């Protein structure tokens, strides 16, 4: 693809820096744990409480 090399160079220069990688490793466990807790909480509300997902998060 024509822009593939440009995107790869941009990622290597701007996104995949040493500091960003350190931040990702440092906070990954925190973010993944929070997502898991949220998912389990919704699952418990659905199974035990008999609630539907649409009742938990109103779309309108």
Swiss-Prot record:
It is found in: Membrane. It comes from the Archaea. Keywords: Membrane, Transmembrane, Transmembrane helix. The chain crosses the membrane at residues 27-49. Its main location: membrane. It is a single-pass membrane protein. One of its GO terms (cellular component) is membrane. This is Uncharacterized protein AF_1161. The lineage of its organism: Archaea, Methanobacteriati, Methanobacteriota, Archaeoglobi, Archaeoglobales.
């Amino acid at each position: 693809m024509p822009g593939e090399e440009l995107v790869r160079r941009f990622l290597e220069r701007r996104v995949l820096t040493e500091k960003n990688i350190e931040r990702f490793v440092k906070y990954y466990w925190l973010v993944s744990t929070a997502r898991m807790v949220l998912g389990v909480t919704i699952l418990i509300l659905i199974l035990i409480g008999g609630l539907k997902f649409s009742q938990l998060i109103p779309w309108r």
